[in-house]
Amino acid sequence: MASLKNKHFMIGLSLTFIVALFSFLAAKLPILDKVGALTIAILIAILYRHFKGYPEQYSSGITFSSKYLLRFAIILYGLKLNIFDIIGQGSRLLAIDVGVVIFSIVMMLFVNKLLRGDKNIALLLGVGTGVCGAAAIAAVAPIFKSREKDTAISIGIIALIGTIFSLIYTAIYAIFSMTTNVYGAWSGVSLHEIAHVVLAGGFGGSDALKIALLGKLGRVFLLIPLTIVLILIMRFRSSESSSKGRISIPYFLIGFVIMALVNTYVTIPSVLLNILNTVSTICLLMAMVALGLNVAFKDLKNRALKPLMTIIITSICLSSLAFIVVHWLYS
């Protein structure tokens, strides 16, 4: 019996790995490189669920990917941060980033209330839009006690919208006159994922990409204080409602902070850093596959339309406001 359970666990884990690896490699191909590995992974998982059903007997391996590998990926994500660079070179951008995070969450909740959408998904999308997309959503989902299908829907939506917006940014840069500093800063402080920032910022050249990444990594850095604030808010609401549910600091966020400090104070060989970043990406993709397998088409039909409209409106407002502020500061 134990050997059968282990076999089913390995098959479930292997399923998420194979789809993740395929998505990772497919995203390097022309056209698909604009779509992104996250979007590809989630779409394949949802389509698999639709045509083949959820592989219940292999659920232990799939659940391992959606929980433990996801948390491990977030811990390694901290290696992208160098706190001295963000506070030093990116201090002006960091000030904008604070406004971006606050605006994204507040605007998302405001529009969601007008549309009468799902508040939990709106919160996840607000954090994802303001901070760093899928990784931020995955980091705060346990704090909000979100269901896996809501987390998957939120990640799928933000991956799709971020890809579309990054392509729109490149078109705007090609058509209109804009300095590399303005374009890079605008991309960094307003696009959803690091991959989206790299796609759009890289189109403006190496100088634009450098400032774009500084702007984006400042938002990733803000995940640390944001999660502390959210935990305190949830604890207050929990005690106010006499709830017995205890809100604790997720251990993987502590790991995220430790990795950020390690990358700041320790010189890590670039080869090792690249390997760890690839491992982080694969683990994150495996988690996305596992989360996507929990989403049925009826969930998308019933729960995704209003959040999709909400994030489009919020992203347009954020992009417009961010451009005005960046243009004023860098022109």
Curated annotation (Swiss-Prot):
Membrane topology per the record? Multi-pass membrane protein
InterPro entries hit by this protein: UPF0324_pro (IPR018383)
Q: Where in the cell is it found?
A: Cell membrane
Q: Which GO terms describe its cellular component?
A: plasma membrane
Entry keyword annotation includes Cell membrane: yes
Sorted keywords for this record are: Cell membrane, Membrane, Transmembrane, Transmembrane helix
One Pfam family of this chain: Cons_hypoth698
- Give the stretches traversing the membrane: 9-26, 31-48, 69-88, 93-115, 122-144, 154-176, 183-202, 217-234, 247-269, 273-295, 308-330
Keyword Transmembrane helix among UniProt keywords? yes
Family statement: Belongs to the UPF0324 family.
Task: List the protein's name.
Answer: UPF0324 membrane protein SAR0338
**Natural source organism:** Staphylococcus aureus (strain MRSA252)
